[in-house]
């Protein structure tokens, strides 16, 4: 709700017409024209980047970390191999994300299962950054993460859940760097039915950072040009093979494919909005979705088996109006 206010001069902050400022009202009540003091200048309404700042303040998203949290993140030591952490650095795990992705927090790998009783089946590994290795319950990093709940992404910036030494450092699965991870190894048959899974902590080294478009283009080219020696093509073939099996299982159980367009905001070099368009949906997107859904199913089954308390997200039966709308 908009309200007219008289802005008091500030001793150290100068502002002009069109500036966006955060204010504090000095009087009580609902007078037509209230008095207010400037607390902070966010930017000018002609600057499109100010929209992100308005949203940050409107939703009270924390942008600074405590000194204790920064100290913990800065002094983080890399994870080492031990009895509780397997060595996956010889496995060709890769990260697959959008071209504008800022964080690389999951990696995938697949190969044909060589066991005789699972002909044409697949072995899959899904690995995520082992954040729990660095963030301990109740420490300063944990407290800061609880304030945020998640990282928040804007077209021109990201407000990370953890200090950048972790979010863009030890917890980012960057290529050719050793990283602690939590992994699940899964075996499926040729119809995409899960036969087994096992969770473990590991040390991994991503072999490449691939975009969805690059993976799809590489796979499509490989399909046409058999015998390619391209490294990414060699990784793409088994990934798509496992995806095809999982997609078969999806169709068998009657899962719905509800395509909700995701918008992509493109900025120019000045940070101004240049274009807004639908993100293209490729099989490479669906591949990652199927792998992540499978990993989540494995996690849910493991927690259930161990009798650990867990919050499950269960979709309620849709109303008739929603079904009709669909």
Language-model regions, residue ranges each:
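Conserved phosphate/anionic-ligand binding catalytic regions in large, soluble enzymes, centered on
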Residues: 121-135, 286-297
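Active-site-adjacent bridging/hinge elements
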Residues: 100, 262-275
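Short, surface-exposed charged micro-motifs
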Residues: 107-109, 185, 264-266
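Short coil/turn segments at secondary-structure boundaries
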Residues: 53, 67-71, 86-89, 196-200, ...
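Extended, well-ordered alpha-helical scaffold/bundle regions in very large, multi-domain proteins
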Residues: 270-326
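Conserved catalytic alpha/beta cores of large enzymes that bind or transform nucleotide phosphates
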Residues: 152-252
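Short acidic-glycine loop/turn motifs at beta-strand connectors
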Residues: 113-115, 188-193, 267-271
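Charge-lined substrate channels and their catalytic hotspots, especially those that engage the 3′ end
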Residues: 1-123, 132-177, 209, 216
